[in-house]
């Protein structure tokens, strides 16, 4: 892809910086090198996880699979084996959809967990857990706290928009449509019940 592993690692570090991962530095492609120059933080892992599921949401289709029978085909024939997900939250935490477990002797047991409830998707990132059970327990605690503080307000009743008048156009006016439904997530534990709606536009009444 990049010609050499080092060139690819350089791209990785550039991309990490673009995502705001200020406390991350890669030294290889696999992430298994036990070096003081190879580091990251739970916050940065959460940023990377968010980018992944935002740009490629289909990854959750695969990371949410608990167990799957795989057929390995070679020239000598085929064999079957069962692949089991290492993310135990898939079976124990409601709404869990992934995402990635990992461990090394330095990083200990790590997890980036993704869960969705009531239209809200949260990410819990855990690092340096002493054992697998602790990483899953801590991730569940973080997710529970997040869901207890977050409430989704979704406005389905969109008011009709007035057409936009045109100047020197092929038509006198064109219809306007909403880019999408209005969504707001309260993160302080309160429910956004009393919401006042106001339509605002950043363009003139007459478009050129």
Named regions from a protein language model:
Residues 21, 25, 36-208:
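Domain-terminus/edge residues, biased toward the C-terminal soluble/receptor-binding domains
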């Amino acid at each position: 892809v990049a010609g050499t592993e080092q060139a690819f690692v350089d791209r990785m570090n550039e991309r990490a910086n673009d995502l705001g991962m200020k406390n991350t530095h890669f030294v290889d492609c696999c992430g298994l090198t036990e070096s003081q120059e190879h580091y990251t933080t739970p916050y940065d892992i959460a940023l990377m996880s968010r980018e992944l599921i935002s740009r490629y949401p289909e990854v959750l289709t695969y990371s949410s699979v608990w167990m799957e029978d795989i057929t390995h085909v070679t020239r000598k024939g085929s064999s079957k084996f069962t692949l089991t997900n290492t993310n135990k939250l898939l079976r124990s935490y409601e709404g869990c959809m992934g995402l990635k477990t990992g461990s090394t002797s330095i990083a200990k047991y790590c997890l980036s967990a993704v869960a969705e409830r009531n239209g809200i998707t949260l990410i819990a990132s855990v690092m340096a857990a002493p054992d697998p059970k602790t990483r899953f327990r801590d991730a569940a605690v973080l997710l529970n706290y997040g869901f207890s503080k977050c409430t989704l307000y979704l406005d389905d009743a969109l008011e009709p928009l007035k057409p936009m008048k045109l100047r020197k156009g092929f038509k006198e006016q064109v219809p306007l449509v909403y880019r999408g439904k209005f969504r707001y997530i309260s993160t302080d534990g309160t429910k956004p019940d009393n919401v006042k709606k106001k339509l605002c536009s950043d363009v003139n009444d007459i478009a050129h």
